[in-house]
């Protein structure tokens, strides 16, 4: 049965996935220490104990997929869809469980790096060479993290030093003039850990917009290739003063230059954006009492972009966020933990163009409390949070979940939560569009599911529903930002990680119904760029010094709007399958050679109507990584 047929029949895809997992003749279950995560509760917890649906992508997963950027890596995770306006470096959006792209909070080592003007995060800028681990928590967790965490949270952890100081690096070359490199040095000397890494990326790319989409684009779009280059630095140092106290500093900065197309220009018009994302963190971790751990953190992040039109200045946007966080974890008993915290966040922005300028700012004060624990076979988690915004006032959110272990391997989980997203500065103050009296967007979610955790196997099936209210859209004449839209997403999400007959298997499937209530006047009930069925199967096998892999992503059709039509018109985005083939050869324990065939079947597809996507590509990597 082909993947195309499976996606036309979502139930058949679900049955096939379960048949693959629960096949006869399964191997004996090996014992394995569960991965430890922190994002699901803001404190350390085994992934098998999390009540929120959580996925971890490790450094080994990144090596296996050989993903060139963060959007490509995230596409392989459960519940996540990605849209992008062209090739590497162009604007990318993440839709988690059918929510809007601004409904996913992105954290870098715990630091907010989103734009307070646009509301989303420029994740296309974040290079994977300096990422050690990605933790993904799906579902409403505003009670833990505040605004934007409606669809979930994606937290990126940068690489850090450990062990004897050593030098590492890699060099990749491939199709479309792609060249990337990474050099890092880190380790531990006495009670001090340190790391510094440098990464660079360049690609000649391809034309972002297909000029043959229609007559309008043929008259407006520059057909030249839209290239991208990026440089990244990641540095951190920490010192253990004594067994109870640690201090540290982290610095991350990435700068890029991307060429892009506009459907409303001429075939000779040149568009460029210079952008940067940076974060700085200073922290102190202190064990005040044996049962009381306290962390005080100051962080600053900056997101900026400068656009040029025909190499002349055309606009500037900058977001500056400064946050002070005091978090306390108190062990009430061996299986009972209390979380108490307070945050102060300052947001400022600069938005300048040839026609308008505004410089908004606001202050946010937050307090949060949480409990997690277990009594015999029952597990519980409760989180409460209050946020006070200087522009629209107070808002409360909660997260309540319970689990019951039928056996040591099988567990039932249920949860309910509320969440919110604060209006962006553009929503509130953009000239001739913003409305300063806007309310935050709201959401309420319910989930119920089962988990099977046995040795190397982890399977989770979740039934979820999220209702959105007060969504901010453009409405009226003249158009203004208004709290009038509603949406609802019902779905079932399945993901499995494990080993069978020597193969490492990572699979997921999401069946969902993302609808606007009432139906959108142009695109109808289905939310734009979101499919009703999509999934991923990754299979990897080690044979001696070799490591082979195949990764198949498949999605069914979506709807979008024509980028050139006025008034807007509904268009369809066809279903597609993407196959990636990888191989890695370990020359020694430290030296390796890796190869990848991206889009191996040369599938023709679109993530955004009118925008091109990468064709088949070949990539070769040489690397040295000390063990």
Where are these regions (language model features)?
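Repeated loop/turn-to-beta-strand initiation elements of outer-membrane beta-barrel proteins
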Residues: 191-194, 244-247, 257, 288-296, ...
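Periplasmic-side early beta-strands and strand-to-turn transitions of outer-membrane beta-barrels
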Residues: 142-143, 155, 162-164, 168-172, ...
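Outer-membrane beta-barrel signature, preferentially recognizing the C-terminal barrel domain
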Residues: 266-279, 283-287, 317-320, 361-362, ...
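Outer-membrane beta-barrel domain signature, strongest for Gram-negative TonB-dependent receptors
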Residues: 221-338, 342-347, 458-459
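Extracytoplasmic beta-strand/coil segments of soluble accessory domains associated
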Residues: 34, 71, 75-111, 115, ...
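Gram-negative outer-membrane beta-barrel transporters
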Residues: 334, 374-380, 464-467, 483-563, ...
């Amino acid at each position: 049965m082909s993947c195309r047929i499976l996606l036309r029949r979502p139930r058949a895809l679900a049955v096939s996935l379960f048949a693959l997992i629960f096949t006869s003749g399964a191997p004996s279950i090996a014992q394995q220490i569960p991965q430890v995560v922190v994002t699901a509760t803001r404190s350390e917890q085994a992934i098998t104990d999390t009540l929120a649906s959580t996925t971890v992508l490790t450094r080994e997963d990144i090596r296996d997929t050989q993903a060139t950027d963060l959007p490509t890596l995230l596409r392989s995770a459960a519940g996540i869809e990605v849209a992008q306006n062209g090739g590497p470096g162009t604007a990318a959006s993440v839709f988690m469980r059918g929510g809007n792209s601004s409904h996913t909070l992105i954290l870098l080592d715990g630091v907010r790096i989103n734009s307070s003007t646009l509301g989303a995060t420029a994740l296309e800028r974040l290079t994977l060479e300096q990422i050690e681990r990605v933790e993904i928590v799906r579902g409403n967790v505003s009670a833990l993290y505040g605004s934007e965490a409606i669809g979930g949270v994606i937290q990126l952890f940068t690489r850090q030093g450990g062990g004897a100081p050593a030098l590492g690096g890699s060099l990749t070359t491939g199709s479309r003039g792609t060249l990337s490199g990474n050099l890092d040095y880190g380790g531990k000397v006495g009670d001090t850990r340190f790391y510094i890494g440098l990464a660079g990326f360049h690609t000649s790319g391809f034309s972002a917009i297909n000029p043959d989409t229609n007559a309008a684009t043929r008259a407006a779009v520059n057909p030249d290739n839209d290239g991208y280059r990026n440089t990244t630095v990641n540095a951190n140092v920490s010192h253990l003063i004594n067994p109870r106290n640690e201090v540290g500093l982290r610095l991350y900065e990435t700068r890029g230059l991307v060429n892009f197309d506009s459907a409303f220009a001429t075939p000779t018009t040149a568009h460029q954006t210079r952008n940067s994302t940076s974060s700085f963190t200073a922290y102190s971790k202190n064990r005040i009492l044996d049962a009381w751990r306290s962390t005080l953190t100051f962080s600053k992040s900056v997101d900026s972009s400068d656009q040029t039109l025909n190499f002349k200045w055309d606009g500037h946007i900058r977001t500056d966020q400064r946050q002070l966080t005091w978090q306390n974890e108190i062990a009430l008993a061996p299986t009972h933990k209390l979380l108490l915290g307070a945050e102060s966040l300052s947001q400022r922005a600069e938005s300048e163009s040839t026609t308008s300028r505004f410089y908004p700012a606001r202050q946010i004060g937050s307090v949060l409390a949480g409990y997690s624990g277990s009594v015999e076979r029952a597990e519980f988690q409760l989180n409460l949070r209050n946020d006070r915004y200087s522009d629209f006032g107070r808002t409360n959110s909660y997260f309540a979940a319970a689990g019951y272990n039928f056996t040591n391997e099988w567990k039932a989980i249920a949860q309910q939560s509320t969440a919110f997203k604060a209006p962006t500065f553009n929503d509130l103050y953009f000239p001739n569009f913003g409305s300063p009296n806007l309310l935050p967007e709201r959401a309420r979610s319910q989930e119920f599911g089962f988990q099977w955790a046995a040795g190397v196997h982890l399977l989770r099936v979740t039934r979820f529903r999220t209702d959105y209210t007060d969504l901010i859209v453009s409405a009226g004449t003249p158009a203004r930002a208004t709290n009038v839209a509603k949406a609802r997403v019902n779905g079932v999400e399945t993901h499995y990680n494990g080993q069978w007959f020597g193969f490492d298997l990572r699979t997921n499937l999401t069946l969902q119904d993302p609808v606007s209530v009432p139906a959108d006047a142009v695109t109808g009930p289905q939310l734009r760029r979101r499919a009703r069925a999509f999934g991923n199967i990754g299979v990897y096998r080690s044979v001696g010094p070799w490591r082979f892999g195949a990764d198949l992503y498949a999605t069914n059709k979506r709807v979008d709007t024509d980028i050139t039509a006025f008034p807007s018109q509904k268009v369809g985005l066809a279903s597609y399958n993407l196959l990636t083939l990888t191989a890695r050869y370990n020359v020694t324990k430290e030296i390796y050679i890796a190869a990848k065939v991206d889009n191996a079947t040369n599938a023709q597809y679109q993530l955004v109507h009118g925008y091109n996507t990468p064709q088949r590509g070949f990539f070769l990597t040489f690397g040295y990584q000390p063990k």
